[in-house]
């Protein structure tokens, strides 16, 4: 097996969901001088359920996470022998291209998420049985309920499921998303009932305390404006850094929520795509309205992901 070094508001309910789901178009505007100054972060507070809907208790267990550095840290991804090497909105035109080599890493580790058989969201593997997505992909703040009927297929290509399909054994998101619909903590983690990542591989991820402005990045996922199960992506750069969000002009569409935002040179995930551009952003801690936005991997999220990926699905 080969290994790649990958660095592991309270608002109205309707506005939160609308911002997360709608797709619009306009010309991106330049960032202002102070766009990267607000790097204050909000701490994570996990809440979860098992496959029967029973609440799960949270208690950190991973010593690897507890000992992570204060300046920045990373965790390696994994390329399986089975994989070969290799809401979002359209900002101006559509720069996305279709990616058909879904059995090649890292595309193989990007997860097509369906709900009741229909295109729903995107995720990305972080271990053999663990994936990351957006919080609104697993919990509806508007309806105040965990979403059911979800299935997860890494490396999907149209109707093809080269690494099979799994269901959720555990589902996690943030208390701030559940109670407030906070866009600053719109993250989700799913423990699967199968070890799909053993064949698909998984991403590494990273965090740093400073800004990511002008970092070259990739954004790939399964949008619902294309044929079901088609993987589309675009290259670009991070335009603005916030404490809990990263902002960019790479084109996306609904159902690309949960997509990995990863650095181009090493395939290291730094954020989780969650929102399209537009109104409904009320604080300086959110991305400027002309940009698409992703939940930033902070130190807290980094440590949480390490912890959750090390847990047994039956815990």
Task: Label the model's feature ranges.
Residues 29-125, 314-315:
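Protease-domain processing segments flanking chymotrypsin-fold serine proteases, especially trypsin-like
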Residues 29, 299-315:
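PDZ/PDZ-like groove recognition
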Residues 129, 133:
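Cytochrome P450 catalytic-core helices
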Residues 1-33:
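Secretory targeting and sorting signals
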Residues 251-273:
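Catalytic nucleophile loop of clan PA
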Residues 158, 168, 183-256, 284, ...:
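Chymotrypsin/trypsin-fold serine protease catalytic domain
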Residues 134-137, 254, 271-279:
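Short beta->alpha transition motifs characteristic of CBS
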Residues 86-108, 115-119, 139, 144-197:
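Conserved catalytic-core segment of clan PA serine endopeptidases
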């Amino acid at each position: 097996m080969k290994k790649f070094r990958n660095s592991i508001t309270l608002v109205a309910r309707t506005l939160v969901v609308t911002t997360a789901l709608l797709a619009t178009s306009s010309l991106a505007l330049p960032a202002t001088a102070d766009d990267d100054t607000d790097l204050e972060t909000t701490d994570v507070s996990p809440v979860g359920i098992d496959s029967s809907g029973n609440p799960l208790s949270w208690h950190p267990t991973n010593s690897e996470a507890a000992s992570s550095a204060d300046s920045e840290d990373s965790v390696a991804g994994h390329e399986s022998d089975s994989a070969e090497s290799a809401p979002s909105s359209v900002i101006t035109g559509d720069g996305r291209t279709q990616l058909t080599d879904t059995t090649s890493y890292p595309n193989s580790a990007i997860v097509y998420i369906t709900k009741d058989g229909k295109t729903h969201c995107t995720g990305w593997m972080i271990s053999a049985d663990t994936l990351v997505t957006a919080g609104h992909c697993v919990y509806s703040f508007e309806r105040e309920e965990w979403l059911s009927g979800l299935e997860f297929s890494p490396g999907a290509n149209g109707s093809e499921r080269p690494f099979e399909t799994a269901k959720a054994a555990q589902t996690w998101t943030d208390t701030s998303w559940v109670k407030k619909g906070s866009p600053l903590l719109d993250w989700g983690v799913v423990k699967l009932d199968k070890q799909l990542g053993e064949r698909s591989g998984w991403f590494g991820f990273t965090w740093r305390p400073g800004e990511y402005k002008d970092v070259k990045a990739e954004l790939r996922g399964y949008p619902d404006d294309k044929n079901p199960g088609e993987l589309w992506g675009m290259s670009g750069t991070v335009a603005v850094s916030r404490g809990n969000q990263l902002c960019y002009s790479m084109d996306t569409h609904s159902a690309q929520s949960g997509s990995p935002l990863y650095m181009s040179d090493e395939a290291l995930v730094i954020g989780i795509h969650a929102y399209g551009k537009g109104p409904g952003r009320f604080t300086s801690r959110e991305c400027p309205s002309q940009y698409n936005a992703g939940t930033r991997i902070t130190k807290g999220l980094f440590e949480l992901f390490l912890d959750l990926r090390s847990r047994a699905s039956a815990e």
